[in-house]
């Protein structure tokens, strides 16, 4: 499945620019010639794509949402997998990364809040050495998506699901500044997304869903979620308790 990666040495190793793997794609995925853009042709599923090479702990995967399509529920999923796409037949890929691919392989992915995957938004995601999966949108603060990625013992490839309202995405160079729109103010809800509720974008996020620990919701929205589905909208874990907290901080790490 490829050589093991040493997190301690990753800073010194030159990295090939990320692109999408050319063969292991969902049944509805169309890639451009450079394998930097992935578009879902139709339906709302079968949009799984992988990076063409393993990704280091702490390495950022940056992408832009090119097209948003109304009429579906839910959007882009991002995460990491130990599944080597070079060993995967496209015809064997399931329709969804969550939960299908997660159940079939060592894969850890999460749904991004719909408000963060509008057309033009830049999404950056990564996993740190503790196995914590983070995502950041535009100039916003990091969101902790989950804390259970296994980073030791085998390489990890980035995996994305061009699902639902997300119709097309483009991989970007996270070290380049060309996609940072200088001079344009970032909407307040994005800058302080770690402090405002990611559902209503109005009230302060002051609750923590247990046991997953996600803390991006105000009390009113959290209790509506608990009553309606009892599942975290970010990681889909079962909610057993809604805890009210006075101060919320997530350790980003690298």
Curated annotation (Swiss-Prot):
Residues in NHR domain copies: 17-174
Tissue specificity of this protein: Expressed in alveolar epithelial type II cells.
EC number(s) stated in the UniProt entry for this protein: 2.3.2.27
PROSITE patterns assigned: NHR, ZF_RING_2
Induction behaviour: Induced in lung during endotoxemia. By LPS and inflammatory cytokines in alveolar epithelial type II cells.
SMART domains attached to this UniProt entry: NEUZ, RING
Zinc finger residue ranges, RING-type: 197-236
Keyword Acetylation part of the UniProt annotation: no
Keyword annotations of the record: Cytoplasm, Immunity, Innate immunity, Metal-binding, Transferase, Ubl conjugation pathway, Zinc, Zinc-finger
Record flagged with keyword Cytoplasm: yes
Biological process terms in GO annotation: innate immune response; positive regulation of proteasomal protein catabolic process; protein ubiquitination
Single GO molecular function: ubiquitin protein ligase activity
Record protein name field: E3 ubiquitin-protein ligase NEURL3
Source organism of this protein record: Mus musculus (Mouse)
Source organism phylogeny: Eukaryota, Metazoa, Chordata, Craniata, Vertebrata
Gene that encodes the chain: Neurl3
């Amino acid at each position: 499945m490829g050589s093991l990666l040493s997190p301690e040495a990753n800073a010194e190793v030159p990295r090939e620019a990320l692109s999408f793997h050319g063969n292991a794609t969902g049944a509805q995925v169309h890639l451009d010639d450079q394998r930097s853009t992935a578009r879902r042709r139709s339906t709302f599923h079968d949009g799984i794509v992988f990076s063409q090479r393993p990704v280091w702990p702490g390495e950022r995967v940056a992408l832009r949402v090119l097209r948003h399509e109304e009429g579906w529920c839910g959007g882009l999923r991002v995460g990491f997998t130990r599944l080597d796409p070079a060993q995967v037949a496209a015809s064997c890929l399931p329709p969804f990364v969550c939960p299908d691919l997660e159940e079939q392989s060592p894969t850890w992915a999460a749904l991004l809040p719909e408000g963060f995957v509008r057309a033009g938004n830049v999404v950056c995601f990564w996993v740190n050495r503790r196995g914590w999966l983070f995502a950041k949108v535009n100039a916003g603060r990091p969101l902790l998506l989950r804390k259970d990625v296994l980073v030791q013992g085998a390489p990890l490839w980035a995996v994305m699901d061009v699902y639902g309202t997300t119709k097309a995405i483009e991989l970007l160079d996270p070290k380049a500044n060309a996609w940072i729109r200088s001079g344009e103010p970032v909407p307040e809800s994005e800058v302080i997304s770690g402090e405002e509720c990611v559902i209503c974008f109005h009230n302060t996020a002051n609750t923590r869903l247990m046991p997953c620990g996600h803390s991006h919701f105000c009390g009113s929205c959290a209790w509506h979620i608990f009553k309606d589905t009892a599942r975290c909208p970010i990681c889909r874990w079962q909610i057993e308790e809604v805890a009210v907290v006075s101060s919320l901080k997530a350790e980003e790490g690298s």
